[in-house]
């Protein structure tokens, strides 16, 4: 495959693209080519559809029209568009969290018998952080108060959002408060963005962007809350060994992919699938093989060792194997095309949420009150599909990688405690100080069809690891790295610099692994970016410095979704240099671009690094880490 035509660096995906071409199946890459040339006004953020006088578009070269019909400038139009993306992303993550809050509430009230408190320790830790009394209280009563506190954080109230003010270092909360950036309520901030960006409201670009920063913290609250509540209900992840890539599918099994984001559905599917093995065998299968796609795949991977099939932009490839019997969907990052592809592959596509249906898919409404019954109904559809598929040819790439995952914040602290039980963070801090660990980089976000799949993630990670940067990853960024072997401990010698190698080996051996931790630590799904925040906040608190002084950076190397926009923005807002590897729709306004890549540093300490070349991006991330080290008086 010629380099200029490279669609994916994943060999399994390349094999399926060849199959799709032979069979005349249109994929996401074909649709991207058909869409070219894409609208330059949209790409630069210079189009506006916020009222019925439009659409308006601004000339990017300085000629007329220089303002919209209402008089909105390029700066205002670009800032409003960015704000709405942040709000949409926050709505996604916080909707996920709200779903979990309602599920926890139903569980402890006896209305959803399939769910229970799985992690009592995490429950008590969260309650203590929120100021909820636990002494002498029943776990169910504590959990109910946690659920109520979570739901209260969605509304405007006199007290600020707890899932912001109690999770960040006090020094960071002070900075954010001084600039009016602490959200009053998650839903409140989303609604206010929609209000202030409507026609006739906020027409000051800097003020609009400050509103966007505040709304992004509502997204952080949704992420952190989603992680907390999922851990209470389904357990806090601990290290687990599994596999990834299309090779995890099995020709002779009922192959079921859970796809989307919320473990409320996928965790039950995993549990019930074990009960239905005999039904699958009676249909002629060897059993039920549950695999994951995207973030709900990450959820069940890190808690149950469920293998990851594929991620993000390549989700259609699982179906093109011909071996996928059912794709079970909840919400977010699901391409509507899966229903069309299913017509070619025979896969049964099953939607489960009232707010996320797809024309052509089978809908089974999933209710927590009837979770087991709904799961059985869904899995029987998969078994029926297998009966129709049995005996037909399939093409499953013989490609898969070993994955060691499940590195929640608690798991990392526990691993470090084997080196220093009294002060678990000290070994990490000592190795940052002595240079064995140069800094930390969080890889987050999606794949984007505009970038050869996984290329940016793997190129940047490879360079950072050689420079002794500790790499953690979430979401489909984690998926990209796992499918290329970055989460296999056997690859530490090849991928890591000597200092990082020594640290990973010392921790692994202290924990009885007989070898190192993997080169990249998988911290979970996209909401689990909160785990990285928890880790760096603990480091900041331990050192007595704010987040904007730590040698910590983030990269959304192949960002696609509005949720990635929100995540990147709150990373900047809490003080992190944050790389974006695709062109964001802000370049139509030089002032907006300058604010986000430079001036915002004076407010939050963080800033965006927009760099499409992955080699150069790695250099810029290293430079940001070195600058932070110098600021702390550390050698680099």
Curated annotation (Swiss-Prot):
Iron-sulfur among keywords: yes
Catalytic activity: CO + 2 oxidized [2Fe-2S]-[ferredoxin] + H2O = 2 reduced [2Fe-2S]-[ferredoxin] + CO2 + 2 H(+)
Cofactor requirement: [4Fe-4S] cluster; [Ni-4Fe-5S] cluster
Membrane topology summary: Peripheral membrane protein
Xref: Gene3D superfamilies: 1.20.1270.30, 3.40.50.2030
Binding site for [4Fe-4S] cluster 1: 39, 47
Regulation: Inactivated by O(2).
Catalytic EC class: oxidoreductase
Chief localization: cytoplasm
Family in the record: Belongs to the Ni-containing carbon monoxide dehydrogenase family.
This protein's name: Carbon monoxide dehydrogenase 2
Originating species: Carboxydothermus hydrogenoformans (strain ATCC BAA-161 / DSM 6008 / Z-2901)
């Amino acid at each position: 495959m010629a380099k200029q035509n490279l669609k994916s660096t994943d060999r399994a995906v390349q094999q399926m693209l060849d199959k799709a071409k032979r069979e005349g199946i249109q994929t996401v890459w074909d649709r991207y080519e058909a869409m070219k040339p894409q609208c330059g006004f949209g790409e630069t953020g210079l189009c506006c559809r916020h009222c019925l006088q439009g659409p308006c578009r601004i000339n990017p070269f300085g000629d007329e029209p220089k303002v919209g019909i209402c008089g909105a400038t390029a700066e205002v139009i670009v800032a409003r568009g960015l704000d709405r993306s942040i709000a949409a992303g926050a709505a996604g993550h916080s909707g996920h969290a709200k779903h979990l809050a309602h599920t926890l509430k139903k569980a402890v009230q006896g209305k959803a018998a399939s769910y229970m408190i799985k992690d009592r320790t995490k429950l008590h830790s969260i309650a203590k952080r929120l100021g909820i009394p636990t002494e002498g209280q029943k776990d169910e009563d504590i959990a109910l108060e946690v659920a109520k506190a979570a739901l209260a954080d969605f509304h405007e109230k006199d007290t600020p959002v707890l899932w912001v003010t109690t999770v960040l270092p006090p020094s960071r909360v002070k900075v954010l408060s001084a600039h009016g950036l602490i959200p009053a309520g998650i839903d409140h901030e989303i609604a206010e963005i929609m209000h202030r960006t409507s026609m006739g409201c906020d027409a000051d670009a800097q003020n609009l962007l400050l509103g966007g920063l505040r709304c992004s913290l509502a997204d952080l609250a949704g992420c952190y809350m989603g992680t907390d509540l999922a851990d209470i209900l389904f357990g806090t992840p601990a290290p687990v060994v599994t596999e990834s890539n299309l090779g995890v599918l099995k020709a002779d099994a009922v192959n079921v992919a859970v796809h989307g984001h919320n473990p409320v559905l996928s965790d039950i599917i995993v549990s019930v699938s074990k009960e239905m093995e005999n039904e699958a065998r009676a249909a002629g299968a060897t059993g039920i093989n549950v695999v994951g796609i995207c973030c709900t795949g990450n959820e069940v991977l890190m808690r149950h060792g469920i293998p990851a099939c594929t991620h993000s932009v390549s989700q259609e490839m699982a179906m093109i194997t011909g071996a996928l019997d059912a794709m079970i969907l909840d919400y977010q990052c699901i391409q509507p095309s899966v229903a069309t592809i299913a017509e070619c592959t025979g896969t049964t596509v099953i939607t489960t949420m009232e707010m996320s249906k797809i024309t052509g898919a089978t809908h089974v409404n999933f209710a927590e009150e009837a979770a087991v019954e709904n799961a059985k109904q869904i899995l029987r559809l998969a078994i029926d599909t297998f009966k129709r598929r049995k005996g037909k040819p399939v093409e499953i790439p013989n490609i898969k990688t070993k994955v060691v995952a499940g590195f929640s914040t608690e798991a990392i602290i526990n691993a470090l405690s084997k080196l220093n039980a009294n002060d678990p963070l000290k070994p990490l801090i000592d190795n940052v100080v002595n240079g064995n660990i140069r800094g930390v980089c969080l890889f987050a976000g999606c794949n984007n069809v505009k970038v050869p799949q996984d290329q940016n993630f793997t190129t940047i990670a490879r360079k950072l690891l050689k420079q002794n940067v500790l790499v953690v990853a979430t979401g489909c960024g984690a998926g990209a790295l796992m499918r290329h072997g970055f989460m296999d401990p056997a690859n530490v010698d090849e991928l890591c610099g000597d200092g990082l190698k020594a640290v990973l080996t010392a921790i692994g051996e202290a924990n009885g692994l007989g070898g190192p931790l993997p080169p990249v630590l998988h911290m979970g799904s996209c909401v689990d970016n909160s785990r990285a925040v928890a880790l760096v906040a603990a480091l900041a608190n331990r050192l007595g410095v704010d987040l904007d002084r730590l040698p910590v950076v983030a990269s959304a190397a192949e960002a696609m979704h509005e949720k990635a926009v929100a995540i990147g923005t709150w990373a900047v807002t809490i003080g992190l240099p944050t790389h974006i590897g695709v062109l964001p729709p802000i370049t139509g306004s030089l002032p907006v671009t300058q604010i986000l890549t430079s001036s915002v540093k004076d407010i939050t300490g963080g800033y965006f690094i927009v760099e499409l070349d992955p080699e150069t991006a790695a250099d810029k991330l290293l430079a940001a880490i070195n600058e932070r080290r110098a600021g702390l008086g550390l050698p680099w």
